[in-house]
């Protein structure tokens, strides 16, 4: 069964991070520039949460706030479930589905952030794994 470390090996473990006092407007510009849907928010260079496109929609647009005078720290999501590189892809899918979230922070044994995985990463890995199984079964059937 595939684990998060397989996802991180494929896509890399680099994360895009901003300090908590960064304006939401600058966070959005960074997300657009990097073509990503979430950004890690830090305080004193330590992880404190994520800002996502959903946070922007719910906490800025729907609340009538302005992205140029609101900080990332004002709208972060801080209570996300944590996973490790050894967490299974199936478990990540379950956590994301049950929590209705699209991103999970990955922490190592020293509680250091070592990556972010998205629902797209999980779906890609699941499809790739199923394709491998189908190819193996196909080879087995044609070998007999």
Functional labels for PLM-detected ranges:
Residues 1-13, 52-82, 88-97, 119-144:
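Tandem CBS (Bateman) regulatory domains
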Residues 9-39, 46-47, 56-59, 63:
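N-terminal first-folded block
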Residues 15-16, 38-39, 48, 73, ...:
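Structural motif
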Residues 17-35, 42, 82-100, 107, ...:
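The conserved cystathionine-beta-synthase
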Residues 23, 48, 81, 111, ...:
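Glycine-/small-residue-rich active-site loops that bind phosphorylated ligands and cofactors
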Residues 31-34, 39-55, 96, 104-120:
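A glycine-centered beta-loop-beta connector
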Residues 78-79, 102-113, 140-144:
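Short flexible/disordered coil segments
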